[in-house]
UniProtKB/Swiss-Prot annotation:
Record's bilayer topology term: Multi-pass membrane protein
Class of this enzyme: translocase
Domain named ABC transmembrane type-1: residues: 45-326
Native source organism of the sequence: Psychrobacter arcticus (strain DSM 17307 / VKM B-2377 / 273-4)
Protein name: ATP-dependent lipid A-core flippase
Gene: msbA
Recorded superkingdom: Bacteria
Source organism phylogeny: Bacteria, Pseudomonadati, Pseudomonadota, Gammaproteobacteria, Moraxellales
Length: 595
């Protein structure tokens, strides 16, 4: 059994964390994210080209101011018609560059979301039951929906800002150094304190981002619970309680979000203030006679304009730290899930099973030390029907999960037709076991697709129709608007409980497996439907090994043998008549059933 997946914690270490030099875990996460971008190198190249064009126009805007100012001072009329044309062309070229950069960044971003989301979903399909036992459904869905979107901030949105504004800063700084390198060196003086501010903010962003992820998982979890249990909520008047619970977790999310806003609201102005101080010193020095006498008015205006144009990209580069840390936190969460051990398949055999089952000294202990089965022994002949009865928690469902290898034994051996169950491939094993659960699972698709589900999709319409007839579902299906092609809605809630159960039985009948497991398959049916379904089940159970988990003992009197479970062991075993003569556990339960 795999190690249970641990949900994200809002706590984070205050150890080494830097926006400039990423610590090893953060660097590893970022490099892993960037690896997803390799197939889109051509789009990134076009993005760089576009933003390089955009950065180049920033220089020419500053340079154009020099030419215009000098032309005005010199009263040069020869270029009067040229400047408007240059202005229009500059902004046209700038627009082309921005389009290339923005479009191809978005293309990479949306494809990354698609690939990550599909990879996470496919990973969920391969994870063992222990993962789902350890994690609420809302937390899992939050990773698939919220965290994947957040990851794009680290890999594409941040990349866009770094390329666009980074190239702009490089271009402008190059222009400033070329124009007057002595004055420009003053701007580098404020670089260390700016990097220190970004480093401090980086630590806080990462911590708060993990907190937001945790609270979003709580929001999704509560929402899923209320939606799935809306009938209980309404029937027991739980609206106020659920509203309060949702409000509390939403407020936690709000507080975490506002803390990020506060951090960003302090971080950005602080960086801008340092830039303003540097700019003020540059202007003060530039206006000194020793400096200004050596340059023209146009050169002065051009230099100051270029220095002023630095403000916006520097601010954006400061803000990108927030996006980057948020994305890295989400990336750590997603990669932790993707690195989870998958359901182990040790099987190498794909036999055609007859249905002989042997359980030899089976024990099953859950991670919380709960003992579900202890030294459990049972031999089931091929074609035999064995009913499992007992109080809730006696180990009936655990036994079924062991047979499908949804769970693994703690000790002991299970064999099918004399072969250890671990030696049979999971796909082969599960293809030869049909199940009808008490909790019916239907999907938001057509009646036909719900019966011919998964590996049964190749079944013909005639086979599906026959299975429905055997389950006494054909008549109500034909009364639906589009017959077998009718949509049944989410979880089949448009159908009655009996109708939903009959579709589930039809699915099991269509599978035609040598081993059949019925978890109180008639529990949701009315008396008349139960009579016909029981007859259909009697037919399908013939010549098949059948395990029946029974809650109403009147439904399993005809079983070949009845095993009474208590405390994870068999305390009584025999036919209905034999067990009644013992006047033990079974007889007492049977009497209570009638009462």
């Amino acid at each position: 059994m795999s190690q249970a997946y641990q949900p994200d914690s809002t706590k984070t270490s205050a150890k080494k964390s830097s926006a400039v030099t990423l610590n090893p875990p953060k660097r590893k996460t970022l490099m892993r994210l960037l690896a997803y971008l390799k197939p889109y190198w051509w789009a990134i190249l076009l993005t760089i080209t576009g933003f390089a064009i955009n950065a180049g126009t920033e220089i020419w805007i500053a340079k154009l101011l020099q030419y215009i100012t000098d032309a005005i001072n010199q009263n040069d009329q020869s270029k009067q018609g040229l400047f408007p044309f240059i202005i229009v062309m500059l902004f046209f070229v700038r627009g082309v560059g921005s389009f290339l950069g923005n479009y191809y960044t978005a293309l990479v971003s949306r494809n990354l979301v698609y690939e990550l989301r599909v990879e996470v979903f496919n990973k969920l399909l391969r994870l063992p039951s222990s993962f789902y036992l350890a994690n609420p459904a809302g937390t899992i869905s939050s990773k698939l929906i919220f965290d994947v979107e957040q990851v794009t901030a680290a890999s594409t949105d941040s990349l866009k800002t770094l390329l666009r504004d980074g190239l702009t800063v490089i271009a402008l700084m190059g222009f400033l150094l070329y124009s007057n390198w002595r004055l420009t060196l003053i701007l580098f003086v404020v670089l260390p304190p700016i990097l220190w501010i970004i480093r401090v903010a980086s630590k806080r962003y990462l911590k708060l981002s993990k907190g937001i992820q945790a609270t979003m998982g709580g929001v999704s979890h509560i929402t899923n619970e209320v939606i799935n249990g809306y009938q209980v909520v309404k029937n027991y008047g739980g609206q106020a309680y659920e509203s309060k619970r949702f409000d509390e977790v939403s407020k936690k999310n709000l507080r975490q979000g506002m803390k990020i806003v506060v951090t960003n609201s302090i971080n950005t102005p602080a960086v801008q203030l340092l830039m303003a101080v540097a700019m003020a010193v540059v202007v003060w020095l530039a206006l000194r006679p020793a400096v200004i006498d050596d340059i023209s008015a146009g050169q002065f205006i051009s230099y100051i304009a270029a220095a002023g144009l630095l403000s916006k990209p520097v601010r954006s580069l400061t803000d990108v730290n927030q996006q980057l840390q948020r994305g890295i936190a989400a990336g750590e969460s997603i990669f932790a899930l993707l690195d989870e051990p998958e359901e182990e398949d040790t099987g190498v055999l794909s036999p055609a099973l007859v249905g002989e089952i042997k359980l030899d000294n089976i024990s099953l202990v859950y991670p919380d030390s709960t003992v579900a089965l202890h030294d459990f022994n049972l031999d089931i002949r091929a074609g035999e029907t064995v009913a499992l009865v007992g109080r809730s928690g006696a180990g009936k469902s655990s036994l079924v999960n062991l047979l499908t290898r949804t769970l693994s034994t703690s000790s002991g051996q299970i064999t099918l037709d004399g072969m250890p169950i671990e030696d049979i491939k999971l796909e082969s094993l599960r293809a030869q076991i049909a199940m009808v659960n008490q909790q019916v699972v239907l999907f938001n698709t057509t009646v036909f697709n719900n019966i011919a589900y998964g590996s049964l999709a190749h079944k013909t319409p005639a086979e599906v129709e026959q299975a429905a007839k055997d389950a006494f579902a054909h008549d109500f299906i034909m009364q639906m608007p589009n017959g077998y092609q009718s949509e049944i809605g989410a979880e089949g809630l448009q159908l009655s409980g009996g109708q939903r159960q009959r579709l589930s039985i039809a699915r099991a009948l269509l599978k035609d497996a040598p081993i059949l497991i019925l978890d109180e398959a008639t529990s949701a049916l009315d008396n008349e439907s139960e009579y016909y379904i029981q007859k259909a089940l009697d037919n399908i159970m013939r010549n098949r090994t059948t395990l029946v988990i029974a809650h109403r003992l009147t439904t399993i009197e005809s079983a070949d043998r009845i095993a009474v479970l208590d405390g994870g062991r068999i305390v009584e075993l025999g036919t209905h008549a034999e067990l009644m003569q013992l006047h033990g556990h079974y007889a007492q339960m049977y009497a209570r059933d009638f009462e």
